[in-house]
Amino acid sequence: MSENLTIDFIQEYIKSNFKGLVYKFTYKEHSFFYNLDKVLKNGVYFCTIKENDGINDKASNLNREGVFRLSCSLCDQDYQNLFGKKPKKALKGEVVSLNYDFSMLDFIMLHPIYAYMGYICINNPSRKNFEIFKDYLELSYQKAIKTYKKRIVAL
């Protein structure tokens, strides 16, 4: 079995390889937003590392010891090229209608709640699958930059 990476390792990779980020930590959720020069109030979502289940987000079973989920968002075209058509939005408290075990470890999959918005995730990535997920982080970063530029023009 491959070595699973730590949250610290992944955070260090993100902070070292993606510039212009703002980091926020709340309720065991490490969130990164693109906000070059802090022009926007909160910035634009880039990626999240979540360590626990939420009221409406239990499908990943993150309350297991040492389990976390790395998530990011892809633009529509990248998402469709990689995963096909987006599922419909889930009802509050439910997960998207997909044939996944969202609690699986080290498997790149659609996000159990936000797949309809283009989010993907992996629980406890191994070094091998993190290398693959890095490409998705880059796509998410480029999406965040593009969205940021649109928003600052509108100011």
Say what each PLM segment does.
Residues M1-L155:
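Charge-dense, helix-prone N-terminal extensions
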